[in-house]
């Protein structure tokens, strides 16, 4: 019989956890699993609890909470044979959604009962492990504002994005990987081990947790009129088609910026040095996965692709009109000068 330790963060996420012990008692397969519950008492406690569970021989440690709790539990299980399971109770649930776990907790317990475990990749940014995404720029800035807001949920995140997006200033970054070095002015830079931030906002639709690579996304500055397009393309899984997006895969990247600033790992913000090291750790964590997950569901469908193409063509037409307008203005200016009218 296998043993599961359920780690619950009583204050994380947007879902009450009061009924979860009863749900586990009713729906967990008791012929296959014994279990116990432990609760976190402070930030970082889930990592210690997960380490203790793994050291005592637990077969599975289940994180009950949001991406922050999942990150803490995952950190405690890196390099062990103890698998991490997830009962998603957060505001974004990025890793659970990437793994195509249902948001219904009973159905998640059904998946735990199937006991399908895979060894997947993780990442590290300046010494901090992550499992979904890490980055700097606007998303790290919003992660800080979100943490300061005092309330969770998608609407809080959107509110912070709308409030801060108009005034945020892009930075210049020098990015070096195995292929060389380039300099970009960017709104944000994200390194993705998994495909989304959470709430089905796909920053890296093609990211895989089993390819030994990170998807690096460089979002270059864009205009206010383009902001709705960027949002829609993230939800449509077509952000990689946007003309302001540059993507590549890498095992390791070194990023230099002009001064220290914010970074984030799985949505947790912190101040860091001007130099940032990001690397993948292949096959570093065992995870209970959904054996019925359809990988194709992470890719855009025909309607989503068509919407992306429409936006792309509109953007191209707008660019051409702008360029033609500038050419006409330049021609008119030359003509006026020849006529000594200007």
Predicted features by range, described:
Residues 128-134, 183-192, 197-198, 215-218, ...:
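Short hydrophobic-aromatic micro-motifs
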Residues 17, 218-342:
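ATP/nucleoside-binding phosphotransfer catalytic cores, i.e., glycine-rich phosphate-binding loops
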Residues 10, 64-66, 89:
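Glycine-rich beta-strand-to-loop/alpha-helix junction loops that act as flexible
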């Amino acid at each position: 019989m296998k043993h599961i330790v359920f780690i619950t963060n009583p204050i994380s996420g947007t879902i009450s956890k009061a009924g979860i012990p009863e749900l586990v008692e009713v729906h967990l397969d008791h012929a296959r699993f014994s279990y116990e519950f432990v609760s976190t008492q402070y930030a970082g406690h889930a990592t210690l609890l997960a380490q203790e569970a793994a050291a005592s021989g637990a077969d599975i440690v289940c994180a009950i909470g949001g991406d922050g709790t999942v990150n803490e539990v995952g950190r405690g299980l890196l390099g062990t044979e103890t698998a991490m399971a997830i009962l998603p109770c957060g505001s974004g649930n990025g890793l659970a959604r990437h793994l195509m776990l249902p948001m219904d907790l009973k159905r998640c317990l059904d998946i735990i009962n199937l006991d399908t475990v895979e060894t997947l990749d993780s990442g590290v940014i300046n010494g901090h492990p992550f499992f979904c995404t890490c980055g700097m720029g606007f998303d790290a800035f919003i992660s800080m504002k979100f943490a300061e807001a005092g309330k969770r949920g998608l609407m809080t995140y959107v509110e912070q994005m709308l409030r801060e997006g108009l005034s945020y200033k892009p930075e210049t970054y020098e990015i070096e990987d195995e292929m060389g070095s380039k300099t970009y002015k960017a709104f944000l830079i994200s390194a993705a081990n998994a495909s989304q931030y959470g709430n089905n906002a796909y920053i890296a639709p093609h990211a895989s947790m089993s390819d030994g690579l990170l998807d690096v996304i460089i979002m270059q500055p864009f205009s206010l009129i383009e902001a709705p397009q960027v949002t829609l393309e993230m939800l449509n899984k077509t952000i990689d088609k946007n003309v302001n997006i540059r993507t590549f895969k890498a095992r390791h990247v070194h990023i230099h910026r002009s001064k220290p600033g914010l970074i984030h790992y799985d949505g947790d913000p912190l101040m860091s040095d001007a130099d940032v090291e990001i690397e993948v750790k292949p096959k570093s964590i065992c995870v209970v996965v959904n054996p019925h997950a359809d990988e194709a569901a992470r890719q855009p469908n025909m309607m989503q692709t068509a919407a992306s193409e429409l936006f792309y063509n509109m953007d191209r037409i707008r660019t051409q009109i702008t360029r033609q307008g500038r050419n006409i203005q330049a021609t008119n200016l030359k003509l006026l000068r020849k006529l000594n009218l200007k």
